[in-house]
Amino acid sequence: MPRGFLVKRSKKSTPVSYRVRGGEDGDRALLLSPSCGGARAEPPAPSPVPGPLPPPPPAERAHAALAAALACAPGPQPPPQGPRAAHFGNPEAAHPAPLYSPTRPVSREHEKHKYFERSFNLGSPVSAESFPTPAALLGGGGGGGASGAGGGGTCGGDPLLFAPAELKMGTAFSAGAEAARGPGPGPPLPPAAALRPPGKRPPPPTAAEPPAKAVKAPGAKKPKAIRKLHFEDEVTTSPVLGLKIKEGPVEAPRGRAGGAARPLGEFICQLCKEEYADPFALAQHKCSRIVRVEYRCPECAKVFSCPANLASHRRWHKPRPAPAAARAPEPEAAARAEAREAPGGGSDRDTPSPGGVSESGSEDGLYECHHCAKKFRRQAYLRKHLLAHHQALQAKGAPLAPPAEDLLALYPGPDEKAPQEAAGDGEGAGVLGLSASAECHLCPVCGESFASKGAQERHLRLLHAAQVFPCKYCPATFYSSPGLTRHINKCHPSENRQVILLQVPVRPAC
């Protein structure tokens, strides 16, 4: 066995030794100690008496110990060589009593108190747990001193000093020490039941404190458990999964296995209290208290398990402008049909018909046509529409003078310009190449007839000056310069070689 395996070594020097010392002369003095030297090498008495015996004088005890050490050694023991026969070797040959510690050192009586201070003031908790208290050792020493040689040849206190393993392992040596010591003066040894095993804490000094602590600890944990259970009971819905827990019945429902004993694991549903034989059956069980909440879209009947998903889905069902636009043209179409029947339909190829759908028409327009009640957002769209009406009336052969509200509403002009317009009648007619008759003056663009040339010129200036582009080679008129250019390139390719005046301003003569 390796050295230092059983006993913890420390920095402080102790009288314990684990090997034979060859050159020391103090060993003989230790063996010849009047107090406990002879207890190590003296052979056992043939019949130890448990009762107390009177201690012999110190001189006789010293001579007896010396004689026993030099001459009375057993056979298995090595030949005596002075005091070295009592060192660590075969202790069973010198003392047949049961020894529980293989390291039984030699000690002096006068160093007992110093040994107590060294061995029990160590900083290691292991040594404090492994060895008894100094009071018990001192008490044992007092009792052993009274017993003398009748205690099996041991010094007072040796059973407790040199057998720490016995104190930790069992009660055999303590019982033997009690029997060997017998009733003597001094305090009794501590009972074996009071000696605790190593690694355990000492019991509390009072017995009233542990129950108080034990009562306080559960009291501190109970409110937490109650609060947790109460919180779990409040959670009865799942907003994401769409599940809800219904309220339980008043009486607890009976288990499925009627009349059978309770299952071993007691796999019980915590909601409906139904019992199952195994956890797999409990996992597959569909509780009657758990219901699925469905959120259905009222527009398309689509089902969702979360109300937030339904709200996101319903954003796609906002009212669209297509149905409103489809309902709006119904009265407008009726008005166009009436206008189509009243003036009739025939017009030139380049002029739109009044009954046609105009892309500029709008229900919320600010400019309204008094013929068909159609509204336009811009005056230009309304003028274009009125020209179509006038061309239709001219083709029918019954031209009517446009109402005054059309001209006044669209182009309100000052009245003082009328004489200047009348003075420039001849020049304006010559520029446009118009042949005015004595009876009436027709508008070359829309075919309206006027009583005077000034009225016709005013009509041309206000209504057709900026938007009408007449063709030089044919009586067709256009409302934009690109339209006139396309017409000339398509219908008059041979005359396109000449320089064409795209726009002829109508101005009165100075």
From Swiss-Prot:
Induction: Up-regulated by transcription factors, such as MASH1, NEUROD1, NEUROG3, NGN3 and TCF3. The keyword Cell cycle applies. A zinc finger (C2H2-type) spans 267-287, 295-317, 367-389, 441-464, 469-492. Residues 64-74, 209-218 have a biased composition (Low complexity). Residues 1-20 are annotated as: SNAG domain. The keyword Cell division does not apply. GO terms for cellular component: nucleoplasm; nucleus; transcription repressor complex. SUPFAM superfamilies: beta-beta-alpha zinc fingers. Expressed in pancreatic duct cells. Expressed in several tumor cell lines of neuroendocrine origin including pheochromocytoma, medullary thyroid carcinoma, insulinoma, medulloblastoma, retinoblastoma, pheochromacytoma, medullary thyroid carcinoma and small cell lung carcinoma. It is found in: Nucleus. Gene3D superfamilies: Classic Zinc Finger. Residues 43-59 have a biased composition (Pro residues). Residues 329-351 have a biased composition (Basic and acidic residues). Residues 1-110, 176-226, 315-362 are annotated as: Disordered. Interacts (via the SNAG domain) with HDAC1. Interacts (via the SNAG domain) with HDAC2. Interacts (via the SNAG domain) with KDM1A. Interacts (via the SNAG domain) with RCOR1. Interacts with SORBS1. Interacts (via the N-terminal region) with CCND1 (via cyclin N-terminal domain); the interaction competes with the binding of CCND1 to CDK4 during cell cycle progression and increases its transcriptional repressor activity. Interacts with HDAC3; the interaction increases its transcriptional repressor activity. Sequence-specific DNA-binding transcriptional regulator that plays a key role in neurogenesis and neuroendocrine cell differentiation during embryonic and/or fetal development. Binds to the consensus sequence 5'-[TG][TC][TC][TT][GA]GGG[CG]A-3' in target promoters. Acts as a transcriptional repressor of NEUROD1 and INS expression via its interaction with cyclin CCND1 in a cell cycle-independent manner. Negatively regulates skeletal muscle-specific gene expression in endocrine cells of the pituitary by inhibiting the Notch signaling pathway. Belongs to the INSM1 family. This is Insulinoma-associated protein 1. The lineage of its organism: Eukaryota, Metazoa, Chordata, Craniata, Vertebrata.
